[in-house]
Amino acid sequence: MEKEALSIAINNSKGGVGKTTISGNMAHLLSLCGYRVLLADFDSQGSNTEMLKVVNNEGKKLTRKDIDELNVFRMFIGPVNMNNYIFHTQYENLDIIPNAQTVKNVFGNGTFDERFAVEGLPEGPRKYLALYDNLAQIRARYDYIIMDGQPSINNTARITIAACDYVLSPAAADLFNVYPIRQTCEMIRFCNEQLKRNIGFLGFFLNNVYDVKAETYLQLREEYEKEGKKFFDGAGYFVDCPIRFSPAVNKSGVTRQFWFDYAKNHSVQLLNPCKDLLRLLYNELELIEKSHLNELVKNGIRSSDIEKVTGVSIKVDENKEDTHAEN
């Protein structure tokens, strides 16, 4: 049986925590590591779509009107042909389900239940699994499906979480994010208990941290560890791998470049957020296999930078074409 994609929803019911930034850069990093990645832009702002050149099989770039007519939210309420919603980007291993701020939510007026009644779709818990069923069509094509969801507690968010294998939550470096993350965990519990899913929570981490050595951050980290254990049945789920702030991150967004591209295109050392994201995915969450670190070197990332973060030595031969990871 062919291996199917691992799907991860980047979710937090609170906006402004960097969910879209993390999901886009995470998908890009995994693609640089040689994984086949699908980035599902389910955030109605469509910011990740704006970061990418979205093209069809003929190489034609999609317009905003093209994306409007697609209306990705149709896959949330019933069966669709997923081939009509997946497009290539300028990156070899990265495809996207595009979205745009002008796309109207298919639920429109009325409640979620009323819309399902109009569509003549299944009643009961099964109605939350339309996206899960649709993604089953294409799981074998990819290694990872990264989903950027909406920052809210609504049925769109529930359907997104119901479709994934794991949830990962970025949080702002303040004390106002514990409850929103708890809400995310409650949605996971709903999906597992009511929909008979088996969704795991990878945990939450602090994003956009200015100074990891500052006393205020150390106090904040201690508070999050304590609150995490208090609210999550002692499990904690706090991932002590902060993503640090970097002024260059703002520049990369303005120029519509992912972090690793910005560093490579400007011939600078890996930005702190690049190092932290690599550390999060390789060291902490183990989503990147050691053998795939070689692909980063082939994609222009310095082997010395990779070794500093991961502890893995990447041997590069003299012609710099063949690489392999060493212990």
Q: Would you name each region that the model predicts?
A:
Residues 1-327:
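P-loop NTP-binding core
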